[in-house]
């Protein structure tokens, strides 16, 4: 069984998208408590805060995405963004590294940690 690799930027974008849907769902739950205005308002505010949090996450990953290194994936020949020492292609999920010490080694995201010594 092969391991499914995923690009870090796409993981964060997926998290932000899930925050939007979770926030809308929580706010929608407030409709069922129309009789109690406090509970309804609480649900709607928590849902609204989740949507605002997703906006902050989208803004943050957008700013981070502008600082990343763009490379051409050797497998699919498409441009992809590299975040950290090891990452995966955004299109084909091919494990990538720009560190010569890690070439040929098994893909592991622990290589991105500052505490890791190669």
Curated annotation (Swiss-Prot):
Its main location: membrane. Keywords: Cell membrane, Membrane, Transmembrane, Transmembrane helix. GO terms for cellular component: plasma membrane. It comes from the Bacteria. It is found in: Cell membrane. It is a multi-pass membrane protein. The chain crosses the membrane at residues 12-32, 43-63. Belongs to the UPF0295 family. This is UPF0295 protein BA_0538/GBAA_0538/BAS0506.
């Amino acid at each position: 069984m092969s391991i499914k690799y995923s690009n870090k930027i796409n993981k964060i974008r997926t998290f932000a998208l899930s925050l939007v849907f979770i926030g809308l769902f929580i706010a929608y739950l407030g409709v069922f408590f129309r009789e109690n205005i406090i509970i309804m308002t609480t649900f709607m505010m928590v849902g609204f805060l989740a949507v605002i949090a997703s906006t902050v996450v989208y803004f943050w990953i957008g700013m981070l995405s502008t600082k990343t290194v763009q490379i051409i994936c050797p497998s699919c020949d498409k441009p992809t963004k590299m975040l950290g020492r090891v990452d995966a292609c955004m299109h084909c999920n091919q494990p990538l590294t720009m560190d010569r010490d890690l070439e040929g080694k098994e893909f592991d995201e622990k290589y991105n940690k500052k505490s890791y010594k190669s």
